[in-house]
Regions:
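Hydrophobic, aromatic-enriched alpha-helical segments typical of multi-pass transmembrane helices
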Residues: 6-224
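Actinobacteria-biased recognition of intrinsically disordered, low-complexity terminal regions
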Residues: 1-20, 223-260
Length: 260
């Protein structure tokens, strides 16, 4: 079965849509920054970001809506990533991981925490034990956050490895972001087990994910897929036919416009 790629103009348009979606998602993904005005006590770093969406919290609808909006935008971004990367190494896997970040954000916006550790002492105590952390894995809201974290960390590293061929600068940037996201996630677990607040590291990880999404948006706007299309002057010329066959079978590459 032969799979026909969309025309170059259509792929470019899809890439641009993915780029602008990524930039939009970068803003909405870090909507917790608005808590400085909606819930000042939660902006100090001690509370979980998800507590902003808990029932009864002021403007909880705003933060849940922002999670849903960013999730949808990230899923669209995944399509743009796939279209631009095409047949590059890890292209499909990177696109799936980006989409998983979006799905995780969607689930975050449609589910809530079972309790608020910043105001519930029993809930806070459960957060600081290994058994309590394992019990949280039975909650969809916790699972979605874990999926989003792992997908962002692994996706950023794999995207960086993919980009090293066409742009070492972009590749190193993506890898650095991915490793830092992973480090903050591991630090969160250590802090939870130690009974310390993780609000600061959780917010840092969220900002890093937003930075990654913004980087993807800029990358998609600057990237230009190269399509190899050769049409022989003489359809009956064996040499010309061979040239066309080789050109059509070549793996598409991607170039990135570097700023000076």
């Amino acid at each position: 079965m032969t799979i026909t790629r969309p025309p170059r103009q259509q792929r470019r348009a899809l890439g641009d849509i993915g780029a602008y979606s990524a930039l939009f998602a970068a803003l909405t993904y870090s909507s917790f920054l608005l808590s400085r005005w909606t819930r000042p006590a939660a902006s100090r770093g001690a509370a979980f970001i998800s507590e902003l969406e808990a029932p009864g919290q002021p403007y909880n609808w705003l933060f849940r809506l922002s999670d849903i909006a960013s999730g949808l935008a990230i899923v669209v971004t995944a399509l743009g990533v796939f279209v631009i990367l095409e047949q590059q190494r890890w292209a499909k896997l990177v696109s799936v991981l980006v989409a998983c970040v979006g799905v995780g954000s969607l689930i975050d916006g449609t589910t809530t925490m079972s309790c608020s550790p910043s105001v519930d002492q029993r809930c806070a105590a459960a957060e600081s034990t290994a058994s309590g952390l394992l019990q949280q894995l039975n909650q969809l809201h916790t699972d979605s956050g874990l999926i989003g974290f792992l997908s962002a960390a692994i996706g950023a590293v794999l995207l960086g490895m993919t980009l090293m061929v066409s742009s070492a600068r972009w590749g190193r940037l993506m890898i650095a972001i991915g490793l830092t996201i992973a480090a903050t996630g591991l630090l969160d677990i250590c802090l939870l087990l130690a009974g310390a607040d993780i609000g600061t590291t959780e917010r840092l990880r969220t900002l890093l994910t937003s930075a990654w999404l913004a980087s993807i948006g800029i990358l998609l706007l600057r990237a230009r897929p190269i399509l190899t299309s050769a049409k022989p002057a003489n359809q009956h010329d064996p040499a010309a036919k061979a040239t066309m066959t080789v050109a059509q079978s070549a793996r598409p590459q991607m170039t990135i416009e570097e700023s000076t």
